[in-house]
Amino acid sequence: MFKSFSMDLAGRKLTVEVGRVAAQASGAAFMHYGDTVVLSTATASSKPREGIDFFPLSVEYEEKLYSVGKIPGGFNKREGKASENAVLTCRVIDRPMRPLFPKDYRNDVTLDNIVMCVDPDCSPELTAMLGSAIATSISDIPFAGPCAATQVGLIDGQFIINPTADQKQVSDMALTVASTREKVIMIEAGANEVPEQIMIDAIFKAHEVNQEIIRFIDTIVAECGKEKHSYESCAVPEELFAAIREIVTPQEMEEAVFTDDKQTREKNIAEITAKLEEALAGNEEWLAVLGESVYQYQKKTVRKMILKDHKRPDGRAITEIRHLAAEVDLLPRVHGSGMFTRGQTQILNVCTLAPLSEAQKLDGLDENETSKRYMHHYNFPSFSVGETKPSRGPGRREIGHGALAERALIPVLPSAEEFPYAIRTVSETMESNGSTSQASICASTLSLMAAGVPIKEMVAGISCGLVTGDTDDDYLVLTDIQGLEDFFGDMDFKVGGTKNGITAIQMDIKIHGLTRPIIEEAIARTREARMYILDNVMRPVISEPRKHLSPYAPKIKQITIDPQKIGDVVGKQGKVINKIIEETGVKIDITDDGSVNVCGTDEAMIDRAIQIITGIVTDIEAGMVFNGKVVRIMNFGAFVELAPNRDGMIHISKLSDKRVGKVEDVVNIGDEVTVKVTEVDKMGRINLTMRTSDLAENKTAARTEEK
């Protein structure tokens, strides 16, 4: 049965249609927010997947180019590989949804979101987040929802709920918050050094709006919701846990995990697993879930150590950061390099500079974003965790980590006018034991400064974890979590920022939400740790951006010309600009506003190219002197190229102070000559002279002017 539900959301109409399309999905919501239309569906398999120890949730977000009136490029004219924005949207939908499914549920679940129409003022990403929550809530899939999401901007100190496209361009914050009925379950933010208290207030402003949306979803579920289906639990039998505890005591397990060396811990657990396999040999049913059992035993042990004994697996205090180290200039011929080490996590970052034409071209749904000048790429090779796997290119995790560090650094980068370069930083994970994305922020800052990029402030990143008990008041926030505390804990709260405020947040949790006190403590902890890293580790290594670029980096000089003369510089079919490039070996970028960036490794050739361009766009007037090349000879005189496509003629009588019988007696094709403009007639023809007396007059005038 088709039903439609509507509410006002930030001054725009949100309409949810149920039963109109996709009737065979477990749940489907046809979402309309303003003129944005997204189809969100939730579907589950009828049986659990065998042989896995995780919940197999897949989230898809498909950006259809017809939604913005475009036909895809390429030979096939079809949408291809998911864009970076689509991948990041999948991750931001996944994070609030995943904790709300049962932990022992092993049926495959797919959340599909198809963007069918885009209103720039109504975010399709937000619409898909709401659509996935609604589709799952009304389906028969077990789900502890609903949840809702809201975006918040900050303009002139005022919070803007679900900002429009124009508002996003001037906002100091891009915050997305997802909530359940009582708690915050997901935070994603980019910000222009926003103070911590303002960020906290914005988070809970969004949380208030989310409660209105949840009440709206409740009305939809009340009318259209299906009864949740029963499922086969994959929980480990208590009898097996009891048997394992008799073979390996809690004290033995605690001793196995209590070490600051990741590989030693893994070796200890492998020995315990082998001991259990030998003891339980013959019981195939128990052996099939032994791996999950050992994992759960480790988890319970680590959580008890932290929450009850205030003892972390590597012996650190609750607020203590692992050993830190930083250095720059590891690679001699790259444009900039920096390495940041935190315990057994190590990132080597390399910075590369290029002309603005090398900026990444974007062909997505956002008409305001057609290119990206700063790119941060994150790589995670298998050797960083001591494993052997073939390299298959970046996955969703790598793209997400790269984007988080990129978002943290964008607010401190110089503008294209101040620093006319495209910038790429690449974070290579050398070693990993938690928080590699935050180490990437620190390493990127080091390499940018080493490369001479004049960033406004240094940026550092740190992550906090969480272990909770049975009540909201029973919890412990951990500063600088390592991998084990991430795996077995309840939260990974990543914050990047400067001494002035926050530039990026990403919060992942495994429980049903966080209270305000936990969020406030986590943000306060990350600020304290960030300031320590900036002042005691990074600044002693490099206190400010270098004043000069690497000798191996391209040099760029910028001039501005009259936009109406861009065509003169480019020439018919690009002949003029290509000739300049061929002659000087530089790269030339021209924008519609008349900005000209000339890039090359030889500064003399850059200056030569600028001289040529200046000659092309300069209005030639009588009295001006040029150094030109003879390009054509006639019996009545010679033609001299003053600038590309700008020739002047020297009459034979003006070639010398003496009488000239033949032009070739004075000049030949290819000769470099100094000439003076005597006249520019009404037809634009330029008359020149080489007479010494004429040139001397000009030189005398020039010398007088210099004085």
Predicted regions and their residues:
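Extended amphipathic alpha-helical scaffolds
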Residues: M1-F30, G34-S45, D53, S230-E369, ...
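Conserved phosphate/anionic-ligand binding catalytic regions in large, soluble enzymes, centered on
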Residues: G27-A29, C122-I141, V328-C351, N433-P454, ...
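Glycine-rich, flexible beta-strand/loop modules in the N-terminal catalytic cores of phosphate-handling
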Residues: A25-T110, V115-C122, E188, L330, ...
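Flexible, glycine/charged-enriched surface loops at secondary-structure junctions
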Residues: K103-V109, A144-P146, I213-Y231, Q263, ...
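Short, hydrophobic beta-strand segments
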Residues: N113, I185-G190, Y231-A235, E246-A256, ...
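Mobile "lid/hinge" segments at catalytic clefts and subdomain interfaces of large enzymes
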Residues: D140-V257, L448-K547
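Long, basic N-terminal domains or extensions that often function
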Residues: M1-E232
